[in-house]
């Protein structure tokens, strides 16, 4: 895949106007992996969307070490003009920022099922009917800022030791086959494969309703 991107961006760099920004949509390949040898590498970056991209507005912009700040700024302005919500990573990280945050949650969810702490259905409920309700209109920093009388510093003083102890227990997780099979089996019991397409359409309708609500109730 990296080689395909290298070849494609070499063609784009040769054929496109010098002032055009070249952005790649990718979930895990940084711009530095396929643009280093390009004469126009300073105008290349990653614009990482979120699934489904036609409904979720966030776009993560990540340049290579040689990407010109103007290329990122112009891309951010364009995304904002067309109704997206651009965020900018100031340096490359493996998997990009959104995927890293999602990976931490998904890995812990699998660990909890593996260790017999909670069922697949109840883990989903913890996010759907707990964390997700707040996260649909505020991020983790604003959440903790409101969760202690003195804001973030007070939250860290009160809960930092507990959070530190929890994260110390979270060794790297390898998505072992037995746990993956268990999670998949519980999901197929809850939602047969034949119903996935309909459920995906339902998800899209719920996302549209949430977006409409957010437009009517600006934060």
What are these regions (language model features)?
Residues 21-91, 95, 99:
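Rossmann-fold dinucleotide-binding core
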Residues 32-35, 76, 103-111, 124-128, ...:
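Predominant activation on well-ordered alpha-helical scaffold segments within soluble catalytic domains
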Residues 39, 66-70, 104, 118-121, ...:
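Charged, alpha-helix-enriched surfaces in structured cytosolic catalytic cores
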Residues 53-62, 82, 87-115, 125-141:
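Active-site-proximal catalytic alpha-helix in oxidoreductases
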């Amino acid at each position: 895949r990296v080689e395909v991107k290298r070849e494609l961006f070499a063609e784009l760099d040769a054929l496109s106007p010098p002032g055009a920004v070249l952005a790649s949509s990718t979930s895990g390949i940084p711009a530095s992996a396929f643009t280093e040898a390009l004469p126009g590498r300073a105008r290349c970056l990653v614009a990482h969307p979120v699934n489904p991209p036609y409904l979720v507005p966030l776009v993560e912009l990540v340049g290579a070490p040689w990407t010109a700040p103007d290329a990122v700024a112009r891309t951010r302005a364009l995304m904002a003009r067309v109704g997206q919500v651009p965020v900018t990573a100031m340096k490359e990280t493996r998997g990009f920022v959104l995927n890293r945050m999602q990976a931490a949650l998904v890995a812990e969810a699998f660990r909890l099922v593996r260790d017999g702490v909670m069922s697949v259905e109840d883990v989903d409920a913890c996010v759907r009917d707990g964390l997700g309700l707040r996260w649909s209109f505020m991020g983790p920093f604003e959440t903790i800022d409101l969760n202690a009388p003195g804001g973030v510093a007070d939250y860290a003083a009160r809960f930092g030791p507990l959070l530190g102890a929890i994260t110390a227990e979270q060794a790297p997780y390898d998505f072992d086959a037995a746990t993956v099979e268990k999670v998949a089996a519980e999901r197929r019991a809850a939602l047969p494969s034949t119903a996935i397409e309909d459920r995906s359409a339902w998800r899209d309708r719920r996302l549209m309703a949430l977006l409409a609500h957010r437009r009517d109730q600006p934060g």
